[in-house]
């Protein structure tokens, strides 16, 4: 993480005096000294603090030192506050690091809050710290915390539809820091807050403890959370196995946040928490019981920066502290301390740049809220309580033969979403258990009465079951007969004689209007050329009076096996708005072809490569959403997967709805190109690495390959630079495919400009083209992801407008085809003139005969100007000369304002009125747009020459004001789009009270411009305005180039 330039000095507690004139920063550390069982022990965290200080030293030209005040081994709630008080009294630190234990952290946090001193820790997981009241207002947790674990558990319950109850078991010896109690506390509070019935019990480490635990489980819940040492879990599971609680009706979540149970130990191998030094029968029972266990751990950051950090951490721990640390999730805490220190330095720098000081601890802590940045532990996201969002992993017995536990899901705390790896959870009964099965807990329910049935009831029940079985059997037989009849009827078959071919331009004319988005060149379906880069038109024809797309199949004949017949039936059955409709197939040799719905706008690749089409992000998100919907439906259908998804296989119909084509009918597909041809490799740019290797894949694997292809298409849509764009590299498709197939780290993927794209969109791309198929999301998850950051959603205005224009143009072509060209030309001129007089949206409403409703705008900026001395000039000139002068001047002005997001309202004589912020709202950009336009007009006037008086200087007087207005159309004859409100009057007063060749702005406009900090303004003073009284006004002098200066 790059830090802005700032002079820092970290003064040592044993270093003596701060250098005169230097701005020193003192860090104080309060952490356990020797006890390595704590993830936040000083020998574990100290190397990370040293590495953070060195990182600051590399980024900043300063002398950096640090010291610590260690505690003696244990988490002492008495020694920790005493140490903190000593540090404050004798060294006055600017930042406290630690403690990690809950009780000491609570004591020290109260002191730090009183001192207004930032307290940064990656421990202190208790839920109570999330409430940043007066006691903990300066506490910042950059590590995991129990409430975030609770959020993950609530998300799990929502996924599995567990909404009734849960049971919690934990070990609590009430000694030291009670880690199990505070960990499960977050789960308890989160589930209780979700209106679940949650019961908890402390596990008794005594004879009879396992029996008490299973009795508690039977009475209180099928979803069980256990937090304690692994030995405790083994004892409970062995008793549960004896009582048949591991039959699939219960699921046991083991909260092992540091994953110690999954690490190799003296009696177990890696990923096998069920192994223990027990008898053979007990070991087998444990292995079977662990099929019902899911382990929850923190997620180790997958980024290479963390791996490098961990290697350096282990080396520094050995060299500086003499301890041997191994790879462990406990090292994540050290990384969180590292990121926390760099985050503090970044925020402190911003605070000083804004005029604050390092003593302003509350301000520094407040600036950390809601911050996002990339650290060594990955993406660091702080919530509004200054607690870091935490990622978790859900582990399950992924391999029943070996018993190895593998990741089943990853949870992203920043996105509040679970990403399933694709490895199924081995539910004993094939599905997750119910958390509230009938008659399990509510025994008072009358339906739970187990009184034996009478003989008459048994006979009636048997008769009913017999009739039901007879009805079901009859239905199945009937369905089977209908299926065979449908297969034999071959409703899909099209004779070659039924397809009519003719002038393609005639089809093109009947396919829809070409007036929208300059799409004449993309009016046919598209195929890739032999070079694999550009598109050519697909074959089209007529079938039963409709234009259809015809795809020829390079096969001599098709054998109608039962499998082929089923493929063709499935193609007829699968119909969806975002899939091209399968019309039929022709199998008459040699004219074998597939006939599908015709989409006149061409392929998605055509549209993306057509530079004349301006695709805004709302339109792009609409195309992406259509593609995701189509693939989600396809994956859930009988066809199951596409297998060859690419942008050229996504076509757009006349209403700009994207549809997927070339799916299904595997028996018809063939590759015509040679194995080493350029076109073949160009088509493989969208192909997943596992398919490039040539190994056959199961259905789920093909679906994950489709997700990879979608990721490449997503990059095409975002950058519009072609498939697999590589910045600065000129590689052939064959070279690209070979690099992807090799799979060497770092994996070869397209280039992404993170500065220009939505961060969540970039993250989705990277997950879709992950090397491991299990890491890729499915289209159901992608649909939810797209829905979150495409908040516009729904049918767009553009889509509705295009649909109406298409329908209107088609009707005209059919009714008056001979006069269409002349009519359209006159219509185009009339519309162009109308759009110059009125805003486009208003003109469309008037064209439809609708009443234009007045619209209120909360904030716009209005520009008024006139010519000083125009009356005298007019008196000395002929009327024709005056008209020529105004025409020259306003033609110049009109050309200039086209470069800005403004709307010209009217010109009356020498008065010129312009507004920004309506009719299209542009957020807060209206004030700077008008300011830049005014400066440009003032600059143009200086060089403007009057034809009949070339030696006279034209003097323009400008007034600008910002405020609310109401806009609407006035009158029926020669309607005008007018603005109303006091803002218009005030803007006029600003102009009339201004001075020649100056820009007179109000205080509200000045405030709006000050938010950018790049405009030069000068106070004019209080000016008496007619009807307004005194108003404070300013002169706009110009705009500074470049960003505001840094401290």
Swiss-Prot record:
It catalyses: GTP = 3',5'-cyclic GMP + diphosphate. Changing residue 297 to M: In AMD1; markedly deficient activity. Residues 513-786 form the Protein kinase domain. Changing residue 708 to C: In AMD1; no effect on subcellular location; changed glycosylation; no effect on C-type natriuretic peptide binding; decreased guanylate cyclase activity. Disulfide bonds join 75-101. The modification Phosphoserine is found at residues 513, 518, 522-523, 526. Its main location: membrane. It is an enzyme of class 4 (lyase). One of its GO terms (cellular component) is neuron projection. Changing residue 882 to M: In ECDM; the mutation results in higher guanylate cyclase activity; causes a 15-fold increase in basal Vmax; has higher affinity for GTP than wild-type in the presence of NPPC; might lead to a structural change that locks the enzyme in a conformation mimicking the ATP-bound state. It is a single-pass type I membrane protein. Phosphorylated. Phosphorylation of the protein kinase-like domain is required for full activation by CNP. Glycosylated. GO terms for molecular function: ATP binding; GTP binding; guanylate cyclase activity; hormone binding; identical protein binding; natriuretic peptide receptor activity; peptide hormone binding; protein kinase activity. Changing residue 959 to A: In AMD1; no effect on subcellular location; changed glycosylation; no effect on C-type natriuretic peptide binding; decreased guanylate cyclase activity. The modification Phosphothreonine is found at residues 516, 529. Residues 1-22 form the signal peptide. Changing residue 187 to I: Does not affect C-type natriuretic peptide-induced signaling. The chain crosses the membrane at residues 459-478. Residues 861-991 form the Guanylate cyclase domain. Receptor for the C-type natriuretic peptide NPPC/CNP hormone. Has guanylate cyclase activity upon binding of its ligand. May play a role in the regulation of skeletal growth. It is linked to Acromesomelic dysplasia 1: A form of acromesomelic dysplasia, a skeletal disorder characterized by short stature, very short limbs and hand/foot malformations. The severity of limb abnormalities increases from proximal to distal with profoundly affected hands and feet showing brachydactyly and/or rudimentary fingers (knob-like fingers). AMD1 is an autosomal recessive form characterized by axial skeletal involvement with wedging of vertebral bodies. All skeletal elements are present but show abnormal rates of linear growth. PANTHER family: ATRIAL NATRIURETIC PEPTIDE RECEPTOR 2, GUANYLYL CYCLASE. Belongs to the adenylyl cyclase class-4/guanylyl cyclase family. This is Atrial natriuretic peptide receptor 2. It comes from Homo sapiens. The gene is NPR2.
